[in-house]
Amino acid sequence: MIVRTVCRAKEKCLEKYKNILKYKEQLAKQDQKENETTSNNKDTSSSVPKPSNFRKTKVQNQYNRVFSIDEKVAEYEKILNDKVNMIDAIFNKAEKIRDLFIGTEPLTKELIKNELQYGAIVLNRASDLILAFADNNEPREPEFVLNTDMIVNDLKPLLHPTRIFDYSSFGFDDVNKLAINPKIRYLPNWSINYIRKCIQSFFTSNSNIEVQNLHNYSNHYDNRIYEHAMPNDVKLQILIGLDKMFNKLSIQHRFGTFETQILSCFFMKQKICEYEAYMHLPDCVNKSKKLKKGTETVCWQYLAEIIKHYEGIPFYHHTHSSKFGALDNTKISITTNKEVSCCLPSVMHGLLNGIIGELLCDLSTETALIYAKHLMNCSATSTYQRQLEFKDSFRMWPKLCYDSIGYALAVLYSKDMKPLEHRVEKIDSEFWFDEEEKDKLSSSLSKIPSYMKPFVNNAIQNCKKRGDYINQMICDINKIKLSREPNKFETHDLYLESGKNTEYLRWLTMTSTIISNFGIYNKTSLLLEYEKSISTKTKVMVQQPEPKVSLITEQGLQTPILHDWTKVPVLNEMSSLFDSEWKSTLVKEFEDINDFEKRFVTFLTNKSGGIKSEEPTLSKELKGISNARIIAFALNRNDYQIESKFLNMLIAHGKCAIRFQIDRRARVIVIVPNAIQSSELFLLLGFNVLKSDKRFNEKIAVGKQIGNLLDAKAQMISSGDVLSVKNSSDMKGMDAHTLPNLTLFLRRKMIEVLYELDPTGKCARYFFAEDKEYCLIQHHEKYHEQFVRRLRGPTIHAAKCLYYMFSMNMYLEDNFFSKGMNVSDQTFQSGFFATSAQHTLFLSLYLLNNERKYFSKLDNRMIRLLHSVMGDDVFEVIVNGVKYPNLVKEWLKLRNQGLSKINYEEDVSLSRLFGVFLQQAAILGVYVPYPARMSLFCDERSDTTKRHTLDMIKIVLEVLSSKSQRSYAIDNNISIGYAIWNCHRTSRYLYTDRDKSLIRRLVDHDANLDKLFVIDLSKFENSVRLVYPFVTIMTSPISWPMLYFAHFKIDDPNCTILTYRAKSPTSLNGDGAFLLINQMFFTSDEEHMFKFVEFVKHQDKVVRLKLSSDFLDWKERHTWGFTLGEHLLRFKRLRHLTESRKSELGLGEIEVMVHNLNKYLDSHRVQMSLDSFDQLRKNKITVPSSLMYVNHNRAKIEQSLTVRTETLDERASLDSTFLRHVFSYSIVPKDIEVLKTHALCAIKVRTYSDLKYALSVDGYLPESDDSSFNVILPFLPGYHQSSSYGRLFRYTTLPTVHDRDISGTMGEIVGGLGASFDIDSAIEFGAYVYNINRNLINAAASAIGIPQKFVSKYEQLVQAFIMNNFNLKYHSIFHNAKYFGLSGSLKKFSEYGGYSNKLIRFDTINKMEKFHNAFTRDLVFAYIDELNGRRVYLDYSIHSLLLIMSRGSIKYFTTHLYKLFNPLLSLELD
């Protein structure tokens, strides 16, 4: 069977190749004919083509003259034969490769050069060979094998899509060109073949578009179809739009192609099985004890049937014909005569995501089958749309499980999220708003699809049985208590079994989300989504307040400044509360602002501001980036000073854009022009003030997210209290429900604040509006009174902006069903600077007002309310709510009635056990992650596919690390990462005649380096195939966990094979890779580096040491590919791109913009920055240019140059630069800084298993307090004891609340300096300075422009950073996303590392402790699986110690040596 499949795959490859050659030949003849025609029509002097075209023609003619099609086909057949042999070799060693990727089989150089390389290149130029892998007949575990007939039946609707098109469901209105209430908003399960056939037939015959069996179709769908009434051109518009959507939106790769992604899955295998990953789940959950391969997953088996049906992937995503071809999102060719559904690519994405979910144990075999069946069910109509429609019904049923559980274990916390105790809680029932809610949910189970129903019913019954089981255990313990105290084993069993109940509820909650989320971005047309997303939804009207004071403009118009809120009862109470609680604070803060214009420029970023400038005087390059906000302002800043020009900018078009999301519908964004944003400044500044003030920020959650478990602090703490009610409500379409008067409410209140400012204050002018006497009108009930008052410019500016705010039209550019149109809507514009501020402050104010009214009644104070608000997301904890359900209902009734009066709708979700806020959920005090919300294979814009191979893999591995933190089997990400890397580590470089000398040099250079890099040079296509060393991702800075290595001992005549165990999945990023890798390559002739006795006897060796690199066997290190991999990763592509674009734009253009923008810098801070720069330079500290305050605007402009994706021409140029970078590679690094890093990391690792270095007194280290909680019930699903993370957690704690406090400080500083301020780089630089001299931290803050009032807070941020990170000469990086539930405190881990040499006086070495702590933590994280709770010992070399002692110099002096040695011990050497 497999032989026949390979032969068929080979035939398909050959057939496709011949078609490509014929197509190229036709193009060449066409070009030649056009050139001849051009030559005949022009005289000789003008007939010479442009050099690039001339070169292209010359190459093509030479290409066609030298090599015939037959020769190329013959050569290609040889290549295919070689690939068939590769496939045989891969199949023979497939299991060995999988075991290698999970660290149980040793990696050898032979495996790298043969089978691993075959896996990397087998599909190159032969993608149809994927059929051989899909149809392979390797043995599978019987328990994982599915019934093929069942799969084929499930796939039938997808593989046979409809040819009967329901045009009317798009709701196209031929008058206004909009889709009115469309029933189809996403790609449907229609045949793309037939869509294209219909389009073609229309253009060729100009006849009516054929619609088959309309009469029968109408009978199937009773109330539809008036096809006869729809104009033919509208049908054509719909079909062309769908074809464009299929081309541009259906494929959403993050990397590679479907073929290479599927091949990656072929090599994947679990490191821990379901039985280990589900160790805390009860036995009612099926747990396989077998390690599952990628080919044994449910979704692989579905995917394989699709591939077998079409004999490959039935479509081809074209690439641009450029170097390292990038995907072209304009054309997807169908390569089969069989029907292909528009939904097929989305289904394949969903199946690939399902494979990853099953390997990470997010899905078991049972739930993966439900997932696959649900995917097929949705795709029968529309993958995207049906998933969104089914979503709620698939996720509500776990509440019935909560209601049935009876007993569960809860974690109780202190206010700072320190776990205090485990408590077995009796849960009689869930909290229901009323009986109707429960009955409605119970009855909804009948509507769940048949493939889901048994699972749900069993889950509810299992919960009841588990509750009864715990109840019996409690009864047994109570009986024991009658005669004696229960022993610790009996009580421990109760906690353990109760913990399984909690774990079961968590698993069910996660499962309900995962099986209904395919991990794909729901992509659609802007036109189809417009009405659903942003068209205003109006159920009630909110009255317009009458003006109290108005400005009389020069044109005689009245512009309201102050309003009378008493006539608008629904807002009057909130207005009064604003005045009493917030107003005075805001007035005081605004009085201290020196210049609002400067603050506005601070908030301008390099993000798009809408339409690009069409100014004819601008260069092409500058026009290309003129839509960036900071650039746009720099170009037309003078127009802001002239009122007439500014008002023209106010009524300019905004632009609609669309963002795609996983598990949520597409979201239309209105890109608001800079001019309107200038008035948003005041609300944004006010918001920053209120969220930073502890008196007001109790409800405001913005700026407090730091990327670890503390982001769910409120949910973790409250869910452990089963007597409180958690309301995880959802505000339905808040943007669309925000009426104009609600949009204006807070902005009008901010004008009232500005009105109160002292007119003679520091900041009088704001662009065109200046400080002067203005003619105003006071509106009374029966008369108006004119008066004159001096006002600050910002007051006038804001008032005039609000007056024109809703006169702005929006430009809707769809590019699928229409080219573009202007639409006018009163909807809330989601692109405002202050969008988040608007919703957060409005809801906070609304809730505060309601609380005051509610608690004015004393009886209501039996409950207490805690709120967290961010944007349109609200989390509410009703303390004691379970005890007083009537008070809860009364409160919710008051709250919802108030919301309905202002046009808002809320979906209330109440629970005793569960809470979710900002997609962070918790149940009974443990975290409930949503792993499906992060997709490994899919990307919103597929931007990563356009990146260089090495940049791509960095991003992919970061996503994988973050995603797997939310899974049950975190450790299984190792195999996934290596499988993806191995199948995507090649690049094909197409070169021109101009590059031939470069390629020749590259090939010659590679030949001298054991042919590590170049694997194929094609004489037919002027192409070279490059392969990156397999071990590259193990090197710094990627530092993916090392595998199990085996190689011959250096300088050993007996050829002893040394093995090095695989390192833990918890390994840190950064320079720790140097420590780990070099353990294999220390040379025997440099043992004196580690044997200090020898060194003391022969101190003359210090002379040789200062230039020596002999401590490593560089030749051996090179042959593995480590040194080359490190060299390739040092290529700074972004820096080269920036320089290239700066060169294109011209230094003059940049300097003019910088000069214009620097006028808005604070002159005092500029001087302080320059003075501090000099101070730091005297201390041999260099401030990064981009961080200098005086360069902030320059940095923004340069960032604008790099925001847009590389063009194909730029990519070709950068790739040539990259290849030149390769030439600088040498086996022994020439860069002295690189050698210094190696020398600094010249430390031998000694573990307890190394008996020579184990101390007899070395016992087990004490476990952390938090670990006792985690062992019984893991805080995260994957932190169980079968996981490296669970083992690591035994010696650390949860993230500290101190980190959370710091996150608010970080938000405060960014709020003051603008969103584009690189706070992370600023903190890292501060940490670097702090580690050198903590007294210089103020100078560092001033140099980078931190205002004086934030300096102390900046120092707090720096100190928090150095608790978890180290960046002085050696970089040890702790990413919160990768260690979501762990503290990485360097001080905490310092106790796990010992010094192996007692001869050295480590206490005398400056900064030794800091370096030692960083080295220790890196080694503990890497070796956690083999330390077994004992210390790791560090055997420092002379190189390492002397580099730690020095400020970076490698000139070692004998005087340094006397500091190193313990004089008492030295006497023994004489």
From Swiss-Prot:
The keyword Transferase applies. RNA-directed RNA polymerase that is involved in transcription and genome replication. Following infection, it catalyzes the synthesis of fully conservative plus strands. After core assembly, which consists in recruitment of one capped plus-strand for each genomic segments and polymerase complexes, the polymerase switches mode and catalyzes the synthesis of complementary minus-strands. Residues 28-55 are annotated as: Disordered. Keywords: Hydrolase, Nucleotidyltransferase, RNA-directed RNA polymerase, Transferase, Viral RNA replication. Its EC number is 2.7.7.48. Disulfide bonds: none annotated. The keyword Nucleotidyltransferase applies. It is an enzyme of class 2 (transferase). Residues 37-50 have a biased composition (Polar residues). GO terms for molecular function: hydrolase activity; RNA-directed RNA polymerase activity. This is RNA-directed RNA polymerase VP1. Pfam families: CPV_RdRP_pol_dom. It comes from Fiji disease virus (isolate Sugarcane). It catalyses: RNA(n) + a ribonucleoside 5'-triphosphate = RNA(n+1) + diphosphate. Transmembrane segments: none annotated.
